Amino acid sequence: SQAVCAMIQRVLQAQGLPAGLIGFVQGAGIEVGVGLIRHPLIAAGAFTGSTRGGAALQAEANARPRPIPFYGELGSINPLVALPAALAAKGAELATTLAGSISLGCGQFCTNPGLLVLVDGPETDAFIQQLTPALAQQKPHPMLTAGMRKAFDAGVQALVDAGASSLLQGEGVAPAPGPQLLQVSAQRFIEHAELREEVFGPSSLIVRCASLAEVPQVLAAVGGSLTVTVWGADEDTAAHRAIVRSATQIAGRVLFAGVPTGVAVTAAQQHGGPWPASTSPMTTSVGDAALERFLRPVCLQDAPAWLLARGGVPC
């Protein structure tokens, strides 16, 4: 962060822009973020982090004498629905791809596929047999902080305590965790909110549905997500329509191929979603439209000629 800030300052100087255009504040405690949100000269806030931290900062933004916009990107479990048709066609290839996505960056991507929604059947049984060893071969690097590693271990244990069974308990080498794969029934997932908590790290929870009809119910229980991935919905069927409809209702980005961990910075990107994925699902925190979060429209009615000549910018 310090190196990037130094580079930014050099660019500002080279372009003749004010040195204070972009600032850098560093600190380990929550008081740093709270202090920034409370500062009277701050006109808007943005945040990427935990649901708990984002909710606290949003409350601070709303508690100001003059509340300010707050754009928080919070928790997301990013369901990946792998339908039997896709697994039958290329299950082994998809298992390898998915294992890499789960462990990418030690699972510390906000778009990490933390929930795998599968439908009972021979294709699913075979896929799990392919995914488990593929994931076991992954060697995650250490997490960003010791606190994050501790939270990861606690999160995995919380899933077990809520009724999930472990399919893979990768043995990490401290301070790096091992990959984890767990499994639970769709009904239990729907009934127990603890199973829907984000576990930030190299793990994924398989939710097994008894039929295609249960898939939309599982997605609805998630509530909000940055992404939903749907593999195998290539045919126009009533079941596929229902699944895709549910996906669009809870996510900002719905993928029909690939994995969600890649987030392209493009005009078409939508990186946000209903709570708890973000505090403002109408906006994106990645892509061209992300700049619009910090712009405010102003109408200049019957403006004088001098102001029009300046393009509406008074000074």
Task: Enumerate the predicted regions with their spans.
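Short gly/pro/ser/thr-enriched loop/turn and capping motifs at secondary-structure boundaries
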Residues: 1-2, 52-55, 77-81, 236-237, ...
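Substrate-binding/gating loop at the entrance of the active-site cleft, primarily
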Residues: 1-9
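ALDH superfamily catalytic-core signature
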Residues: 10-16, 21, 38-39, 44, ...
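Short catalytic-loop micro-motif centered on adjacent basic/acidic residues
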Residues: 21-24, 44-47, 227-230
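Short acidic-hydrophobic, aromatic-tinged amphipathic segments that line or gate anion-handling sites
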Residues: 24-27, 82, 205-210
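Short acidic loop-to-helix transition motifs that present clustered carboxylates
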Residues: 27-31, 52-53
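Short acidic active-site motifs
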Residues: 31-32, 214
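Conserved C-terminal structural/oligomerization subdomain of aldehyde/semialdehyde dehydrogenase
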Residues: 41-42, 100, 116-118, 122, ...
